[in-house]
Amino acid sequence: MSIDGILERAVNGERLSMEDAVKLYESDEVEKMGAAANQIMLKWHPEPITTFVIGRNVNYTNFCDTYCRFCAFYRAPGHKEGYVLDDEVILKKIQETIDVGGTEILMQGGTNPDLTIDYYTDLLRNIKERFPNIWMHSFSPAEVWKIAEVSSMSVEEVLRELHEAGLDSMPGGGAEILTEETRLRVSRLKITWEQWINAMKATKKVGMHGTATMVIGFGESFEERALHLQRVRDAQDETECFTAFISWLFQPENTGMYKTKKLTPRDYLKNVAISRLFLDNIPNFQSSWVTMGPEVGKLSLQYGCNDFGSTMIEENVVSAAGTTHKVNTNKILQLIREAGKIPAQRTTSYEIIRTFEDKEAAEKDFVMQN
């Protein structure tokens, strides 16, 4: 069945249904979807600019009592290989990030049952006292629900205290697939899809924004993928809590799901395009070169992405599953230019800091650590 009618409706600004999304997932006309998604991206972003942010992942703890089957990073509470980083180690990592022009810290960890709200607020105040201008784009719904549980607080109360202590925005990690079927199969102890949605809505209530994410490749159905997109779109309609959408593929190596069939870059590009076509209320789509590699990341700029994501001075979670791609600032500039775009460094809230003209390079750069 031709998908031309669905694509035409999307490009003309008509909202797609879940049934439309399923038909797109069933089709192999990926290039057509990419072209339509690119047209929609250009309506949001008519200038030939692709943005990126200079940031670092800081994984402050790997202790986690959620035991997701797909995670190679966590260690059970009490495990000899588990850790909680000292504040001074975290502060040193932030200083190194600022030294190369970084503006964002994506600080995330496991759901550590030994860390109460006081640990997080003390850490954030310590960071902001030393580095008042760094943007803390940190934690996740699962971590916030764990803090609420061990601190006998509501999620909204936790987010309000974190925000007052220095949290600026919250990434939408841990969404994976927002359906009960897949979550029960791959992360039985993790927060429910409703809890994830409610935490992201609560970020807006306390004066912050967040991002929405999606991970495919757990063996979920096309209907589940469409339902995930529907739930994200509904939450955005209600609260406008998301500044961006990021999707990637599950990396099965070194995990409890290592026998799962690995999806292809083509599957990733199709998902990016369908998401852009469906999510008509989210302005920014980030490439996921960290999992997909820089060349596929570059291709995604033709499939609906307007942003290359973060430089990732450090990354530990994806690399624990056997996937390591190292890209510094000047490599990102090169990749964006190869895609026919003008690179521009941005803040976490998508304000442009600097546009790199012609062959202009970053004066300060780094070697990715992990």
From Swiss-Prot:
PROSITE patterns, alphabetized: RADICAL_SAM
Pfam families associated with the record: CofH_C, Radical_SAM
Gene3D superfamilies the UniProt entry points to: Aldolase class I
Keyword Iron-sulfur recorded: yes
Cofactor binding, note field: Binds 1 [4Fe-4S] cluster. The cluster is likely coordinated with 3 cysteines and an exchangeable S-adenosyl-L-methionine.
Function: Radical SAM enzyme that catalyzes the cyclization of dehypoxanthine futalosine (DHFL) into cyclic dehypoxanthine futalosine (CDHFL), a step in the biosynthesis of menaquinone (MK, vitamin K2).
Protein name according to UniProt: Cyclic dehypoxanthine futalosine synthase
Organism encoding this protein: Halalkalibacterium halodurans (strain ATCC BAA-125 / DSM 18197 / FERM 7344 / JCM 9153 / C-125) (Bacillus halodurans)
Organism phylogeny: Bacteria, Bacillati, Bacillota, Bacilli, Bacillales
